[in-house]
Amino acid sequence: LAWMKYAYTNYYNMTPKLGQAIVLAGPMGKGKTLFIKKVLGGLFGKEPSDAGNHMVDGTPWTDYVVDSPIMAIDDQEALTSAQQLAKFSAMLKKYVSSEMINYNAKFKQTGQVPWFGRVVIACNTDSESLRILPNMDISNAKKISLFRTSDHRMQFPARETTERLITAELPFLA
């Protein structure tokens, strides 16, 4: 919760600051995507952008990514080579530690824009899914927090009920 409070408080006070990326790893059905889309999206006032196409697949377009304060990489296909992992890890490090991000949209002028958002990665805990984890060398270790969900099976209410509960309770979390 400290990660979220730090990001939200600075965002709310219009004093943006850089912060850590987080990785949420756990079995299917634990609410990782729900947390990213509904809790973080609700707190920050905008649904997280799907950064997988840009950060993992390598598409150059970032206009949709910088449009949201949260970049989400959710159950993305695993990285298949050491070179891809190194590139992904370097990009993640850059987005976490730099105040500027390249802006690139089709048929528009490119440039750099300020971005103080957060990167959130969600993955399952099978060996294939965990291949999305960035390198945790010395330069990245302080920039990324890793969290693992419990293996306890959770029974969520119906989707509409869950979303209604989150909408009702979210103001008290903020």
What residues fall within each predicted segment?
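Alpha-helical scaffold elements adjacent to nucleotide-binding pockets in ATP/GTP-utilizing enzyme cores
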Residues: 35-39, 87-95, 139-143
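Switch/connector loops and helix/strand junctions flanking conserved nucleotide-binding motifs
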Residues: 32-33, 79-82, 127-133, 153-158
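Signature of the SF2 helicase/ATPase Hel1-core->accessory helical subdomain module
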Residues: 90-100, 119-120, 125-127, 134
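Conserved structured core elements
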Residues: 18, 33-34, 82, 86-89, ...
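Conserved nucleotide-sensing/catalytic segment adjacent to the nucleotide-binding pocket
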Residues: 61-113
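Phosphate-sensing "switch" segment of ASCE/P-loop ATPases
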Residues: 113-118, 131-174
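P-loop NTPase catalytic core of nucleic-acid-dependent motor ATPases
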Residues: 1-76, 145-148
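A short beta-strand-to-loop transition that corresponds to the Sensor-1 phosphate-sensing loop
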Residues: 75-76, 105-108, 116-127, 148-152
